[in-house]
Amino acid sequence: HPENSAEYKGLTVNNGVAQPSIVNPYLKRGRYRHRQMSAGDYVEGILKGDVTILGRAVTLVESTNPAHQAVAQEVIEKCLPHAGRSIRVGISGVPGAGKSTSIDVFGIHVLQEYGGKLAVLAIDPSSERSKGSILGDKTRMEKLAVHPDSFIRPSPSAGSLGGVARKTRETIILCEAAGFDKIFVETVGVGQSETACHSMVDFFLLIQLAGTGDELQGIKRGIMEMADGIVINKCDGNNVDKCQLAATQFRNCLLYTSDAADDLTRVD
């Protein structure tokens, strides 16, 4: 620098440090874009248990683009012979009942006790105004989210009724083909008539809270009579007595809504 010459004895300028680029170099080279995959590529990756390709396949299935739907249909048809070998559990309940937190604890217990691989399909409600969805159920599953043998896929309901997403059945097929032998389906927060999940799973678990209604609410036909098991959650602290009362009320309700005598053991 000329400022370092003799006539500028009181001023010294050092060479600066080059700043790194803030642009991703892969983006600059054009490598960031995903390669267009064929149906065969998807199927090959799914059968190998590649969760990245599995996630992309689920996105493809959920897409409303006609071109994507054509490829998705071919992928599902090729994965179908490899599906049907899992244990499917549906978890439903009112908003705030603790479905996601319960899945986190129960899922870790299942993986530790029985091994295998677990897929969790968490359905979040979509906004009627913006059509968007937060997809925040995964944030409640802190342990499962980092477990190497688990796969958590949040999906928007996209206006679908019944507590599940439009393509939940197809997503189950893909997960089974990828080698997941245990699948949990978490519905959106439901009311009394959202029972679509029941027909998709082997065991349908209903999570309830104490103080959400009396016996009259319980004997109303709907989701209560479809549940294979009922759990009264958040039974601790000052809530123990209320939960015990709620369990008694639900057992009494099952006398009117169920035919089997052993159904009284469904409430815990």
Model-predicted segments: where are they?
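Hydrophobic anchor at the beta1->P-loop junction of P-loop NTPases
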Residues: 89-91
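Single conserved hydrophobic/aromatic residue that forms the stacking wall/gate
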Residues: 256-268
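Conserved beta-strand/loop subsegment of P-loop NTPase cores
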Residues: 205-207, 226-236, 249, 255-258
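Hydrophobic positions on the alpha1 helix immediately C-terminal to the Walker A/P-loop
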Residues: 102
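Conserved lysine of the Walker
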Residues: 99
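Inter-motif core of Ras-like GTPase G domains
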Residues: 195-210, 228
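Nucleotide-state-sensitive switch-loop elements of NTP-binding domains
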Residues: 41-47, 55-86, 108-193
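Non-catalytic terminal/linker segments enriched in charged/polar, low-complexity residues
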Residues: 1-81, 113, 241, 246
